[in-house]
């Protein structure tokens, strides 16, 4: 009878250990799933960051091109300003000459 009493206890302890192991494995599977999802999310974030970086690079290149064009326009405006100033001085000289002739 002693052996029949130990058998149910042994069977129960094996079932208990098995149940504990299943619970532990389930927890590990859940943790692994969370890590995989985190990794997947990290990959998505990295991909989005790379796309944003490309967009920013295009914007920077466009801005650089615009600045180059504005620099050229500024140079042309300076030439025009100098030409206008020379013409104003020349017209003042002509006005002085006309006044002198009218006297």
Curated annotation (Swiss-Prot):
Q: Where in the cell is it found?
A: Lysosome membrane
**Keywords assigned:** Lysosome, Membrane
Is the Membrane keyword given for this protein? yes
Please provide, in alphabetical order, the Gene Ontology terms of the cellular component aspect for this entry.
BORC complex; lysosomal membrane
Q: What biological function has been recorded for the protein in this entry?
A: As part of a BORC-like complex may play a role in lysosomes movement and localization at the cell periphery. Associated with the cytosolic face of lysosomes, this complex may couple lysosomes to microtubule plus-end-directed kinesin motor.
Q: Its family?
A: Belongs to the BORCS7 family.
- Protein name per UniProt: BLOC-1-related complex subunit 7
Source organism per UniProt: Danio rerio
Q: What is the lineage of its organism?
A: Eukaryota, Metazoa, Chordata, Craniata, Vertebrata
Q: Which gene encodes it?
A: borcs7
């Amino acid at each position: 009878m002693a052996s029949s009493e130990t058998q149910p206890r042994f069977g129960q302890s094996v079932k208990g250990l098995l149940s504990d192991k299943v619970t532990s494995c389930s927890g590990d599977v859940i943790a692994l799933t969370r890590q995989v999802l985190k990794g997947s999310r990290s990959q998505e974030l990295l991909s989005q960051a790379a796309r944003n970086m490309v967009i920013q690079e295009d914007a920077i290149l466009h801005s650089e091109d615009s600045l180059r064009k504005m620099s050229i326009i500024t140079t042309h405006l300076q030439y025009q300003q100098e030409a206008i100033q020379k013409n104003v001085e020349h017209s003042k000289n002509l006005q002085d000459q006309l006044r002198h002739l009218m006297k």
